């Protein structure tokens, strides 16, 4: 049996690498869509910033693995052989499920998937244990940490609603202040806006990212908690003064600083806190094997109470995992497809091919929203409506230019609101999914920005409903698939484990090595979302430097400026006047 468990551990190690690949392919949308959608920098520059954030987060990660070890079930009630089957079922189900979502281009929560897979597999193991012992099946609740699952479900509901409303409200207020012709407002209050934005991003970086890092001492964390208000005010004041100097003296585009800093912080926090969920299960299996070897007991008699002890992943292992994540960012086509879904649903472009079709719930929501808009328009005075509509009047499209999905203002709002919500939930120890927050903030900001017009609203809402339904399907399918795999291994033994293991690897290889054109290369439309440098150069060639704001240096470096963004982020006027 020892050789069997060694083979199982080797398989779990291979699956861990694959899980990193498919997991990062889905989670990359959390920290890449804002920078890529507004083309604040080239695709390569954005990836380099995200890659550095991922490696830094992996290096400083504490690597705490409580979720995989004891966060979902009570390990002291299971034997070594039972938990090895649970860990095997979880990893097989996880890679298959995440790869399916990646193939569909739908973002989902990797945290929710791993938690409910652990729950489903542990539930199946507990049932087999109770049946063999002749105990009542109602005792299965003693084996599962049910409060964790309720916390995750409540986190899903809360994060979806709060993130959408927050993104919509903040973006609406920001657009009222800046408008689409934001160059004048940028010179007046850009420094204050930048101070608020970067303060929120740094606060998020500390609360969500660095606070759990291995180098953070307990006394440092206590000092930060005791002096949070003073730290935030000092940061805001200092950054505002710095940005005012950069804007007035050096003519620096601070939107680039804000958006790239937000991209780095989200990538850092992702690697620092979420990395271990991809490798936590194989490492928990490895720790279980070492304890079993040291005990000398039979595999079906040794109870795994040792998993209740806190454990951290080795830094070298986390850093190696970080390199795998970076390679995924650069080379995964499915990551690009998931990012494309998020950008398409929040894009200001209209009249183009929509990714999702219309649905009956989408039509009902649109009709209800239009009716509510008519009621509001009758309440608000017409002069106020005209004043608000003038603030939301988009720039006309210049012939020959390709409109961006969204501009710098909306991209920065997406990052700021996401950072504030995630950091606040982390400080309050509330369950929250970063995927749900970042996606719904982007949807709320696009709704408030008028990106969903009469032509595209029903398609965009149908797409959002598809993604949200996929989130709830994640929990059900994850627990069910892991339970089925566990049941098959309990019944079929070693032969079933070997067949399922090789079957999972075959499906993944077949899915990721397709030769069809739409799976190997990006379409022309999606490629235009990413290639900022070539777009900037082509814009400069079409217009004179004086008109386009492109100097010879900018033509060579494709370095975006605020003036250039005003000409490059244009979209068609709406078919109807804007009402609040």
Q: Language-model segments: which ranges?
A:
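Transmembrane helix-loop junctions at the membrane interface of multipass transporters and ion channels
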Residues: 127-146, 205-221, 282-285, 290-310, ...
């Amino acid at each position: 049996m020892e050789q069997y468990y060694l083979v199982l551990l080797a398989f779990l190690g291979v699956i861990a690498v694959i899980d990193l690949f498919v997991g990062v392919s889905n989670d990359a949308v959390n920290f890449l869509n804002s920078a890529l959608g507004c083309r604040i920098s080239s695709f390569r520059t954005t990836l380099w910033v995200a890659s550095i954030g991922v490696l830094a987060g992996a290096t400083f990660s504490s690597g705490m693995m409580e979720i995989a070890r004891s966060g979902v079930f009570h390990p002291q009630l299971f034997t070594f052989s039972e938990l090895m089957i649970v860990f095997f079922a979880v990893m097989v189900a996880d890679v298959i499920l995440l790869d399916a979502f990646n193939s569909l281009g739908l973002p989902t929560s990797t945290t929710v998937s791993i938690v409910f897979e652990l729950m489903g597999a542990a539930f199946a193991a507990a049932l087999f244990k109770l049946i063999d012992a002749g105990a009542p099946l109602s005792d299965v609740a003693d084996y599962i940490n049910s409060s964790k699952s309720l916390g995750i479900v409540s986190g899903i509901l809360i994060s979806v609603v709060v993130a959408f409303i927050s993104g919509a409200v903040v973006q609406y207020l920001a657009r009222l202040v800046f408008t689409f012709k934001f160059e004048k407002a940028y010179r007046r209050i850009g420094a204050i806006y930048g101070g608020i934005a970067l303060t929120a991003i740094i606060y998020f970086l500390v609360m969500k990212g660095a606070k759990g890092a291995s180098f953070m001492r307990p006394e440092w964390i206590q000092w930060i908690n005791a002096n949070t208000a003073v730290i935030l005010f000092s940061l805001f004041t200092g950054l505002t003064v710095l940005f005012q100097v950069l804007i007035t003296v050096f003519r620096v585009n601070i939107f680039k600083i804000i958006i790239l800093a937000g991209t780095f912080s989200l990538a850092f926090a992702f690697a620092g806190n979420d990395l271990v969920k991809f490798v936590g299960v194989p490492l928990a299996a490895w720790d279980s094997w070492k304890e079993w070897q040291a005990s000398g007991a039979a595999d079906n008699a040794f109870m795994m109470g040792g998993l209740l002890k806190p454990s951290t992943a080795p830094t070298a292992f986390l850093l190696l995992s970080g390199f795998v994540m970076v390679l995924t960012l650069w080379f995964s086509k499915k990551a690009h497809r998931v990012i494309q879904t998020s950008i398409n649903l929040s894009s200001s472009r209209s009249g183009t091919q929509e990714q999702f079709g219309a649905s009956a719930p989408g039509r009902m929501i649109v009709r209800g929203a239009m009716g509510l808009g008519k009621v509001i328009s009758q309440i608000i005075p017409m002069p106020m409506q005209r004043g608000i509509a003038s603030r939301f009047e988009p720039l006309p499209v210049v012939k020959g230019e390709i409109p961006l999905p969204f501009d710098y203002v909306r991209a920065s709002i997406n990052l700021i609101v996401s950072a504030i919500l995630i950091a606040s939930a982390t400080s309050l120890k509330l369950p929250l999914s970063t995927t749900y927050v970042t996606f719904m903030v982007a949807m709320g900001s696009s709704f408030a920005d008028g990106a969903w017009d009469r032509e595209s609203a029903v398609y965009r809402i149908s797409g959002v409903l598809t993604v949200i339904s996929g989130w709830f399907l994640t929990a059900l399918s994850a627990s069910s698939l892991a339970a089925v795999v566990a049941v098959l291994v309990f019944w079929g033994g070693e032969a079933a484990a070997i067949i399922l293991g090789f079957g999972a690897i075959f499906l993944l290889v077949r899915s990721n090595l397709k030769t069809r054109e739409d799976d190997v290369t990006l379409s022309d439309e999606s490629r235009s979302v990413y290639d900022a440098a070539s777009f900037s150069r082509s814009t400069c060639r079409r217009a004179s430097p004086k008109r386009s704001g492109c100097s010879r240096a900018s033509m060579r470096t494709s370095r975006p400026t605020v003036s250039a963004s005003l000409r490059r982020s244009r979209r068609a006027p709406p078919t109807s006047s804007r009402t609040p």
